[in-house]
Amino acid sequence: MARMIQCAKLGKEAEGLDFPPLPGELGKRIYESVSKEAWQGWLKQQTMLINENRLNMADPRARQYLMKQTEKYFFGDGADQASGYVPPTEG
């Protein structure tokens, strides 16, 4: 049976992650209160940030920036938006 949690990002009960996605305290916090659905949303956001900002993930400063953005996305006022991103329009 799937592990259900109250998702901090989506504000609803949803299926939780199978394991902590990151090491340390932030990974534990995400595991305990972020759903699979919300995590998938973050992976898309993270990819846009890496691409738009041309982040080199071998650079410790880039990794530190992404960790801060991860925490802001789930538990703060939202992560930075990719500067060149224009949401698709319906129609």
Curated annotation (Swiss-Prot):
Protein's name according to its UniProt entry: Probable Fe(2+)-trafficking protein
UniProt-recorded Gene Ontology molecular function terms: iron ion binding
InterPro entries, per database record: Fe_traffick_prot_YggX (IPR007457), Fe_traffick_prot_YggX_sf (IPR036766)
Keyword vocabulary terms for this entry: Iron
Protein's UniProt keywords contain Iron: yes
Family assignment from sequence similarity: Belongs to the Fe(2+)-trafficking protein family.
GO biological process: cellular response to oxidative stress
GO-annotated cellular components: cytosol
Taxonomic placement: Bacteria, Pseudomonadati, Pseudomonadota, Betaproteobacteria, Burkholderiales
Function: Could be a mediator in iron transactions between iron acquisition and iron-requiring processes, such as synthesis and/or repair of Fe-S clusters in biosynthetic enzymes.
Keyword Disulfide bond annotated: no
Gene3D superfamilies the UniProt entry points to: Fe(II) trafficking protein YggX (1.10.3880.10)
